[in-house]
Each structure stands twice: as C-alpha cells, then as structure tokens.
Amino acid sequence: MMPLSPQLQQHWQTVADRLPADFPVAELSPQARSVMAFSDFVEQSVIAQPGWLNELADSAPAAEEWRHYEAWLQERLQAVTDEAGLMRELRLFRRQMMVRIAWAQALSLVREEETLQQLSVLAETLIVAARDWLYAACCKEWGTPCNAEGQPQPLLILGMGKLGGGELNFSSDIDLIFAWPEHGATRGGRRELDNAQFFTRLGQRLIKALDQPTQDGFVYRVDMRLRPFGDSGPLVLSFAALEDYYQEQGRDWERYAMVKARIMGDNDGAYASELRAMLRPFVFRRYIDFSVIQSLRNMKGMIAREVRRRGLKDNIKLGAGGIREIEFIVQVFQLIRGGREPALQQRALLPTLAAIDELHLLPEGDATLLRAAYLFLRRLENLLQSINDEQTQTLPQDELNRARLAWGMHTDDWETLSAQLANHMANVRRVFNELIGDDEAQSPDEQLAEYWRELWQDALEEDDASPALAHLNDADRRSVLALIADFRKELDRRTIGPRGRQVLDQLMPHLLSEICSRADAPLPLARITPLLTGIVTRTTYLELLSEFPGALKHLITLCAASPMVASQLARHPLLLDELLDPNTLYQPTATDAYRDELRQYLLRVPEEDEEQQLEALRQFKQAQQLHIAAADIAGTLPVMKVSDHLTWLAEAILDAVVQQAWGQMVARYGLPTHLHDRQGRGFAVVGYGKLGGWELGYSSDLDLVFLHDCPAEVMTDGEREIDGRQFYLRLAQRIMHLFSTRTSSGILYEVDARLRPSGAAGMLVTTADAFADYQQNEAWTWEHQALVRARVVYGDPALQARFDAIRRDILTTPREGATLQTEVREMREKMRAHLGNKHPNRFDIKADAGGITDIEFITQYLVLRYASDKPKLTRWSDNVRILELLAQNDIMDEEEARALTHAYTTLRDALHHLALQELPGHVAPEAFSREREQVSASWQKWLMA
C-alpha cells in the first residue's frame, strides 16, 4: 500500500475528529484509515454500519468473492415478507458490497478487470433477485403468465451497455430492456390478466424496487430508454414485437447498443437462446458493412458537440481520447466484420480487443496501447466515482480530490497523474483518428452545416446553447429547442423504416437552417412539425422536400404566413406536389379555365368509379385553393380577385357535381320525357349569399336553391321509370350527397338549401312557376333581400332567363319606403339579437354595428327601395357593383359609394387574412374606426331617417 501524502494525512485527521465518540478509531488499521481518508462514501457507510469494519478485518475483500454474491443475498432475502422489506435488503446489500469493492480497489487488492467484473456481477445479482422475488409475488396475486399451450412465461431482462459487457463502473445507471416470449394470459390467480398486463406491472414494480430512493438510498438508477420506441413504447415487449421492431426500423445506434446486450440470470435456457438467436442477425451482418464507419463518426461528432456545448472539460469518458473513443474503435471492427468473425462477437471490450489484435486488424502495438489506456482510464473513473458514490467522469478541480486520485493511481502528485493521463489519451486519439477520422469541420460553411446537424441530431435541452440559434432571443431559442424535442418524441411513436430515417436526417438540418434564419423561427416550425409528423412514414414526401430545396422554401414561406395553409398541407400531403413549380404555385388558374382544368383532372379517374371521382373533386379543390391562398399571401391577388377565384372554383366544381349526379340519375331512371324535343336539362341551381354575390371566402359554405321546369304529367323513359318531378328531387338530393360525403380528403362544401321557398319545410326542388308565385305572394321582405344577392350558377339558358326575369320582377316591385325601412331595420335587429355579441370587448367584423352585414343591408334596402324606378339596379348581385350602380343612378353620391366600397373591401380583406391565420372574425374594439364611422353614418342616413 502506498503511504498517504501529507495532504491526505491531514485530511485523515479531519475525518478522525468528526467520527462519533463511540467509533473505534484506535482499532483502525492503517489500511482502514487510508480508505476512509480516500472515500467519503466508505467513511459514511462504516459510520452507519460499524460492524462492516469487523467483517472487512476478518474477511478481506478478494477477487473471486463475486461468486458468493448470489448466496449471500438469498440468505438475506429469506426473511423478507413484503416489498418494503425487499427494497431495504437490496439497498443494504448493495451498499455493503460496494464498500468492499471500493476497499479492495483503493488498496489495489484486486486488478482493474476484476473490479469491473465484481461491479457487473453485483448489479446482475441484485436485478435477478429482485425480479424473481417480485415474479413470485405477482404470480400469487394474478396467477402465472402462460402461453397458449399453458407453459409458464418468464420475464427476460437484457442488460445493455457496460452492464451487458460485464464492465460496469462504480456509480452507474443500468440500461435495461424487458421482454417476454409469447402472448397468453395468467392462470391460477384471483383474476386473469393477459401477459402484456402482467409483465408491464411486474416491470413497473421491479423498476420501483431498484430505482426508488428511500431512507436506505437506492439500488441503481434504471434507464429504460434503449427499448424500442424509447419512453413512448411499451415497457415490456413480446419476442415477436421485438423482432418486428428491429427488422423493420432498428436504427444504427440501436444496433451498436445491442452488441453488448446480455440476458441477465439464466443465459442457457430455451427462451434465452431463442432471444439471442433472434437478435444476432440484426447486430452482426453477414457481409462486411463499411457504412458503420460513417455512422460511428456521426455518433462521435454528436458526443464531441455535447462535450463542447456543455463545457465538459476534463471528461475522461467523452473527451478526446477518452473511454468512449476506445469503445468506438472496438465497435467498428465488431460491426464491420463481426458477422464473419465469431471471435469479434463478444460483449466485453478487452477480449474483443485481444481478438482484433490476433486478427491483425490494427497496426502492431496499437491494441496494447489501447488496452493499457482502457485499464488506466477505467481505474481512474472508478476511483473518482467511489469517492462519493457519484456518477461523474469529470476530473476534480479541488486539491483534496486531486490528491486522493493521485494516491489511488499510485503517483506522487497530480501533475504526474495528469501527464500519464495525457499520454494515454493522446494514444487513443491517434488510433481513433486514423481509423474513424477527425470529425472537426474545416471551413466556415462546413462548421455551420455541422451546427444544423447538431441542432437536429443531438438531444438538446432548452438550456443548451447552440451556435445555430445565437441570433434568436432567449424565449425563441427555448421555443425552437422545445419544438424539436417534442417532434423527436413524436417520431419515437411512429414506425419509420431505415430509409425514412435516413431521408429525414438529410432533410431536417436544411429545414432548420431555412426556418431558423427567420426572425419568427418558432412560428413556422410549430406549423411545419405536424405536417412532418404526418408524412414521416411516407418517404416519398420526405424525399420531395429533401431533393427540391425550392419546394422546401415555399413550404416554410406559406406555413409561416398561414396556419390554414399549414393545416391543409398537414391533412392532405398530396398537395406538396403543388410546391414544386413556383411559376404555377403563385398563379391561380385563369378565370375561364377552372371548368376545363377540372374536366382534364377528372379524365384521369374512371368515370364509373364514384369513390375516386369524389376524391378527385376534393383534391382538385384543395390544390386550387392552395394556389389562390399562395397568391393571396404573396400579395398578387387583391381581395376582390381572391373571392372571384374562390367563386369560379366553386362554380366549376358545382358544374362537375351536377354532371356526375345527372349521369347517375339518367343511368338509373332514364330521361324525363319533356326533354326529348329540346336542348338542356330543364334544371338550374341558384346561388345565394356569398356564392351569388361573388364573395366566397376560404371556408364559405354554399347557399343553393334548385329549380326545374318539368310539367306535372311527365315520366322518365328508363326501365325504372319514375315521375319527372320525383326525378329532379332525387337529382337535387344526389347533388347534396356528393357535396357532403366525407372521404379521406373531407367534404367538398357545406351546402345550405334553406333559402328555398318555405325554407326547410319546403320542397328541395321547385318549379320556376312555383318559385315565382312564392316570391310574389308569400315571401318575406328578408327573402327579397336575399334575392338581391342571387344568381343562376348552373342551368339551361332558358331557365336562367326565366329566373332572371322573376328576380327582376320581384326586385322592381314598388314598395312603400317607410314600411320597407322598418322591415329591413327590424330584420337586422333580429339578427343581432339572435347572434348576440359573443365577444363584448371585441369588434365582430361581420356581425357588429358598422360591419359587413350593415353594408349588405344598406345595399339590399336601396335596391328594393329604388329598383322600381331604376331597374338597372338589379343587374348585379355583388355589393361592390351594386354600390357603383347606386352612384351611377344618382341614388347615392359617388363619395359615399366609394367610401362604403372601401370599407367593404377593407373589412372583407381583413376577414380573408384572419381566415388564413385560422383566427376568428373579431378584432380589437378600436380597429377600423374610420370604416365603421362611415358605415354607421350611412346606416343612420338610409335606415334611421
């Protein structure tokens, strides 16, 4: 034993002074004094359990004593009757054995390889004993889990990382994966559970028994994140589920982790052999796999970035030339050649390194240098952790702990130890760089690209600093990191194949660099991640965005500008194709071309396939709306033109729907016989409201009224003949059905037919004569107001002319001014009372006083009031052109007409853009004050005077 340095002798005196009065200080051997001066953990443990000192004196720790761990622990567990007792005994046994291991290590009673073995066997012994005790307890409670043949099913535990390799460090987490062989249910218990439930509950209890801190401490911190799907996945998986996961979507890092996986406990049973055989093809490829080098280089780069980012200076595990680089060197050969060289299929590092040397895979002497460095670094790591039973690999800055490590490593002082350490780490770094290559980026561009890869691939936390985000304020930086972290968690729940992950890893750094160059980075990122979540399992779409940078830029621009567009793209990723050509993306279809475009689009789909026809109609609408929204966002379409395009689009779709419905009806019932000697179909669709007024918005419904001119006695001429008027009723019902059927792309439009004669109580389709009679004799004033904004949007020229004549006759009917004024005003007040002000501290752009509805009521009132003298007022159905007509016919002065037109288009523009933002149509109470004053003044002038 090396004598204590003066500094440690002085520290021992401090330790002795604080020992309890009844502590047998005088009886302590020089060895005991040295170890207690070295390790606070040992000091505190023997103060709490003085009897352990006697055991150490009577039975000094030995290299082979790990062989007795199982028997010693089982002896202590015999008297345990409940989980609390189990947890206490596990903790005390672990602490006592760790004191013995620390004692032997500090005094160099055992070699470093033997210390690693003791630490690993101790952990395995505790894990298996806890599992077996809890398995028996759970079987008593719920019965024994069995497969379909009644064979009992065990819980198998894969120890990962250093635990699996038999190289556990002194104070370490344990990485575990739980599995059970076959599905089935429990038998013989008070109530039956399926095996998944049983093993999940058992797994939860096992983690609690090992991990939960009590007054006796904890056994091990348990990390289950290496299991399939990580924290998002089931706690325990069946063999079949494990096999499916690793075959379909096992990632490179999971393959590397599985190299060291070892089944805890019985390694020779049939189920253990089955599990090993199942995992082997995933880990060791039959061919030489050089792609491993780049993957490991990427992983090493990620670790190096973490070291830099977190300021992990003097880290003997993760730093340059540290333990992790030795592990990487060994894994490169295991993963490249392990499938062909059984000698490389070992879990422990040192035997594998010896096999690498025997196979001459490293230059002469390098394996010897790596072995020496590994043992040096592992001893230093374990000594460092045994000081306080603390999981750390960072060298101390204080003089006391530096003196402790110098003594434990048999060097005279810290400077000597530092020089030895630097020499070992330099040797490791040289071998690593020669084999895997230095990952340091050379040029500024390469460095920047590295930062974006870091941002995506490293599990950055909100407090981490990334150079890529240095230009963002703290709140935005945290938001971006949180969004990326949430997206990564969501990905863990998805089934993504290796190709999909590869493309995603190529795409994301580019996407993040584009988004994070914007001042509003969190906004587009929050809108795009739901889209990406929806397409990660569809590699074609990921490749589209990865291979077409222009499409990616347009996606970010549109999503940043509009959550409506982002939501639409997320729901219907087929629309991503529309981003490929910027020349067409921001250019909506020409005004007269929507029908032709749709006709061409539908030619791709078999005419007889109704389902595909419906889907194609919806896809066409969504694609065209995306083009309109893109032009709207880009500012190339003013508000009037946006509504025009949305209206033309709706008319083209209505035309196609009527054609489809007509074809289906004629195929089923034949043609109404009154059509034999004439052109056309004797059918018309009247658009009311926003459709009639050329004022559709992005989410507007369609107000429709259906007319026909079929005489009462007409029948159809098909094999299943029906009454002609019944034919038109079923035609209208079919049209409504085609609009409202929900496919994977949603519905076409919401359709409202309640503006027909007698409303919801009336016939869905009426004759033109019945419509005229109703309007003349039964309709209310508000129905005549609605007629102002009505026009035929589909129909025979003759029927259209008939409707136009009816509309003109009704609108030009002389009316008594005061009565009309009262009726219009009362209707407006009823609307206000019915709708109510749902946002008392906001201005509802459409419904509140001074808003859009007031303007509409003003124009409708003026048409009804003056059209008898000025029939030209009935020419148009949209408010803007009606206001022009009012000025041209000297009813309203031009200044007022212009002011109302400005107010109307301004308010409608605001509604359009709120819709693009998926925001409700109300704004701050002081907004649009000038426009509202104008509308209120006109209301006062025309309807209150």
Swiss-Prot record:
GO terms for cellular component: cytosol. The keyword Transmembrane helix does not apply. This is Bifunctional glutamine synthetase adenylyltransferase/adenylyl-removing enzyme. Keywords: ATP-binding, Magnesium, Multifunctional enzyme, Nucleotide-binding, Nucleotidyltransferase, Transferase. Belongs to the GlnE family. GO terms for biological process: regulation of glutamine family amino acid metabolic process. GO terms for molecular function: [glutamate-ammonia-ligase] adenylyltransferase activity; [glutamine synthetase]-adenylyl-L-tyrosine phosphorylase activity; ATP binding; magnesium ion binding. Disulfide bonds: none annotated. Residues 449-945 are annotated as: Adenylyl transferase. Its cofactor is Mg(2+). It catalyses: [glutamine synthetase]-O(4)-(5'-adenylyl)-L-tyrosine + phosphate = [glutamine synthetase]-L-tyrosine + ADP; [glutamine synthetase]-L-tyrosine + ATP = [glutamine synthetase]-O(4)-(5'-adenylyl)-L-tyrosine + diphosphate. The keyword ATP-binding applies. Involved in the regulation of glutamine synthetase GlnA, a key enzyme in the process to assimilate ammonia. When cellular nitrogen levels are high, the C-terminal adenylyl transferase (AT) inactivates GlnA by covalent transfer of an adenylyl group from ATP to specific tyrosine residue of GlnA, thus reducing its activity. Conversely, when nitrogen levels are low, the N-terminal adenylyl removase (AR) activates GlnA by removing the adenylyl group by phosphorolysis, increasing its activity. It comes from the Bacteria. Residues 1-440 are annotated as: Adenylyl removase.
